[in-house]
Design a protein with these regions (language model features):
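Short, Lys/Arg-enriched, Trp-marked, Pro/Gly-tolerant hinge/linker segments that flank
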Residues: 3-71, 84-92, 96
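Short, charged alpha-helical segments
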Residues: 13-16, 127, 131
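Terminal helix-turn-helix DNA-binding modules in bacterial transcription factors
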Residues: 52-66, 73, 84-125, 129, ...
Length: 149
């Protein structure tokens, strides 16, 4: 009876209970490992995640904070690392992807230009037209007409 209440058994009980709690937390939330030295790098996998996110959400207002959150980096580190990896800023990449998607829609659909502008995330048809012309060298209407000719 004395052995059950000794300080040694009490300490052993607390340690066992604590280990049990930690084990349950790790099973539920996953093991946490220390960050590797290149934790701030924009790996190929992280770059793919950002690319998929941008392409899947072109119609959304894609902020630098949103893109950085996709890969778990601060917006400062994300922006810097993204430009190092791709040669363009995240904003330039989003615009490039919007124009690329618009070209596809102009080629493959008969949707009105205003609808295409909205579908790929431009705030207005005039903004879409200016940006498209700057990147492609023709307005969306002329691009579509030339493609169909």
């Amino acid at each position: 009876r004395m052995a059950a209440t000794s300080p040694h058994n009490d300490r052993l009980y607390r340690e066992t209970a604590l280990q049990s709690i930690v084990a349950r937390l790790l099973r539920k939330h996953g093991a946490v490992s220390p960050s590797p030295p290149d934790a701030g790098a924009l790996s190929q996998g992280r770059l793919r995640r950002v690319t998929r996110h941008v392409r899947g959400h072109l119609d959304a207002n894609l902020s630098l904070d949103d893109l950085a959150d996709v890969v778990g980096l601060s917006k400062y580190h994300f922006s810097r690392r993204f430009k190092e990896r791709t040669g363009q800023s995240p904003y330039q990449f989003v615009i490039y992807e919007r124009v690329r998607a618009a070209r596809h829609l102009l080629q493959e659909t008969t949707r009105p230009l205003a609808q295409i502008a909205f579908d790929v995330g431009f705030s207005s048809q005039s903004h879409f037209t200016r940006t498209f012309k700057r990147h492609v060298g023709a307005t969306p209407g002329r691009y579509r007409a030339a493609w169909r000719a």
